[in-house]
């Protein structure tokens, strides 16, 4: 089953990359809701966005993307892979979400945001790196723990389906 769930995790990671690519298609300010508050404040001071737009974009991201990601995982684990027990569902969810988390940490945060110009917002370069060492540590900790918690919740939901 591991050989099936790892590619499913890669698919979820690709979905995350696609969401980010769409979000920054007109410039990185389109995803400024994911940046540190200092960067957000600078973008507002420069007239690149407003607090209302940042809040609206953050809400839209949470309302559309998170349910889409969770539905993808449930579809893979229960409809495609046919998990029947809580623990089988939990482990499959955990593998899929963990692979996506690795893509997010290394591929998106580590490389795309950290080593390319795609996420640079003009006028905020002095605030780089956009993801500080402390933020990276928090993302690793909460990302890893969060994936386990989400996996428990999804396995519980899967038992109700």
Regions found by a protein language model. Name each.
Residues 4-9, 62, 88-93, 139, ...:
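Residue-level signature of transmembrane alpha-helical entry/exit and packing/kink sites
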Residues 6-31, 96-112:
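Hydrophobic alpha-helical membrane-embedded segments
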Residues 24-65:
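Cytosolic-side membrane-entry/anchor segment at the start of a transmembrane helix
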Residues 40-56, 120-139:
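Short membrane-interface loop/juxtamembrane segments of multi-pass integral membrane proteins
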Residues 60-78, 139-153:
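Core segments of transmembrane alpha-helices
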Residues 97-105, 109, 131-150:
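C-terminal halves and exits of single transmembrane alpha-helices
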Residues 105-125:
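Juxtamembrane non-transmembrane "cap" segments at the membrane-aqueous interface
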Residues 153-161:
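Juxtamembrane boundary at the C-terminal end of a transmembrane helix
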């Amino acid at each position: 089953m591991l050989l099936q769930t790892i590619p499913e995790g890669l698919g979820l990671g690709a979905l995350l990359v696609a969401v980010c690519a769409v979000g920054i298609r007109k410039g990185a300010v389109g995803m400024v809701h994911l940046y540190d508050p200092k960067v957000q404040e600078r973008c507002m001071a420069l007239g690149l966005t407003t607090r209302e737009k940042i809040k609206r974009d953050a809400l839209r991201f949470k309302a559309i993307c998170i349910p889409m990601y969770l539905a993808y995982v449930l579809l893979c684990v229960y409809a495609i892979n046919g998990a029947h027990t809580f623990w089988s569902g939990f482990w499959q969810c955990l593998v899929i979400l963990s692979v996506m988390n690795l893509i997010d940490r290394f591929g998106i945060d580590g490389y795309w945001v950290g080593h390319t110009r795609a996420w640079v917002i003009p006028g905020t370069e002095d605030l780089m790196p956009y993801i500080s060492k402390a933020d990276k540590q928090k993302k690793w900790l909460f990302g890893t723990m969060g994936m386990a918690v989400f996996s428990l919740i999804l396995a519980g939901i899967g038992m109700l389906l």
